[in-house]
Amino acid sequence: MLGKHTKLFFGVSLVALIVSVILAAWGFPKIVSKQIQKNIQIDNSSVMFEKWRKIPMPLTFNVYVFNVTNVEDVNNGAKPRLQQIGPYAYKEYRERTVLGYGDNDTVSYTLKKTFIFDQEASGLLSEDDEVTVIHFSYMAAILTVNDMMPSITGVVNGALEQFFTNLTDPFLRVKVKDLFFDGVYVNCAGNHSALGLVCGKLKADAPQTMRPAGDGNGFYFSMFSHMNRTESGPYEMIRGRENIKELGHIISYKGKSFMKNWGNDMYCGQLNGSDASIFPPIDENNVPEKLYTFEPEVCRSLYASLVGKSSIFNMSAYYYEISSDALASKSANPGNKCYCKKNWSANHDGCLIMGILNLMPCQDAPAIASLPHFYLASEELLEYFDGGISPDKEKHNTYIYLEPVTGVVLKGLRRLQFNIELRNIPMVPQLAKVPTGLFPLLWIEEGAELPDSIIQELRQSHTLLGYVEAVRWALLAIAIVATAISAIAVARSGLIPVWPRNANSVSFILSPHPNSDVNKVH
């Protein structure tokens, strides 16, 4: 009777061990993965959906302005001396409107951003502060004419003197709120013969920074009004229901699956990555070396490079940051050659130096982007200034902390600086003596950091996953112990063959009877 129970115990233990091994190696990971996918995919029933549709907390949007402190000296050929003023802090609210779902596991949506000035975070700074900055819109206009039709530069400049009020030099004295959102009024009601040409061009194809005035006689120039309370897109994004590894990937923008701003090159024109709000979980066995995001403001995808695994908010995370390769010159990174656009400037082939990006193909204006204070850019850019430019990795780099299990952004900062060339043009009185160089206007810092409530939710999820992991290995351990105990019991009861102690003979215990004969081999 005991032998029968022992054999049964052994059989059950062996089956339990096999089942436990399958569960530990495949079952539990599959169940957990499916549950995570169910929670984070873009679906009306998922936990993530509403947080994705309407971000539950505001992002930070900080603006730093480069105030010019020696205007008269610069007008006479001296190096510019700059003073950084900021941050002018804003709360940025984001809300998406779902337009529909595609058969290929996609969702189409528009994104609306709303900016509200945050006086507390801005400290003593006010939107009514007056600053002196490079006249971005004037320089954009005169550079475009000078590059495309240099012979009429002087004539067009005469029209611009009526278009822009008090145009005595290439600098703008302006209130911060007008520069950012409210707008600086420019006039189309003058009588200069070339003014109709300038305003006609704007009416037909105005850049994003110019919006028509209500009186019909002019425009308002501002850096960010086109982003405020207006819907961008539509975007088409993969929902992650069929393949969680593709979650968040942007496959089209404004109906285009390829950005032709950079020609027909597949590398520069492809849409790669997410909109930086959502990422797929990270496979710990195959951690991506680059994290791509699609940036509509520059009409291209950018990437941050993996630095390593880190810890933030007492949780493990993968840390990515912008590296020098992303904005490298074509000599340092030949892959960036397709971002050169020869047709926009008569002065060079469009291949800019290290650390800066030509925005002309994207914005139809000769603007140039960089990291703040020309961080990771060529040092020759710094030599143009008499002070006020001091690149610092901690203050000026772009980075992101990504939680691997869910792909949630724990913390991230995107930093970008807008620049334009200040060019010496002898035929233009306002530019006849100025030194030529790349001049910064301002830089932005857009950031997200999860609130405590969501961090607690993540920690609870991690705790639950820890319990599941403990159960997974506990069941396997119990099955191993039970199988070992039952195997020993079976062996001791004589139900399985054993090797005898006598090295010169082999015996087989065929039954549990103690008086069984032992056959000896001589």
Curated annotation (Swiss-Prot):
Detected in both male and female antennal tissues. Expression is two to three fold higher in male compared to female antenna. Detected at low levels in all body tissues except the female abdomen. Plays an olfactory role that is not restricted to pheromone sensitivity. GO terms for biological process: sensory perception of smell. Pfam families: CD36. PANTHER family: SCAVENGER RECEPTOR CLASS B TYPE-1 SR-B1, SENSORY NEURON MEMBRANE PROTEIN 1. It comes from Ostrinia furnacalis (Asian corn borer). One of its GO terms (molecular function) is scavenger receptor activity. Disulfide bonds join 268-338, 299-362, 340-351. It is a multi-pass membrane protein. Keywords: Cell membrane, Disulfide bond, Glycoprotein, Membrane, Olfaction, Receptor, Sensory transduction, Transmembrane, Transmembrane helix. Residues 1-7, 491-522 are cytoplasmic. Residues 29-469 are extracellular. The chain crosses the membrane at residues 8-28, 470-490. InterPro entries: CD36_fam (IPR002159). It is found in: Cell membrane. This is Sensory neuron membrane protein 2. Its main location: membrane. Glycans are attached at residues 44, 67, 104, 166, 191, 228, 272, 314, 343. One of its GO terms (cellular component) is cytoplasm. Belongs to the CD36 family.
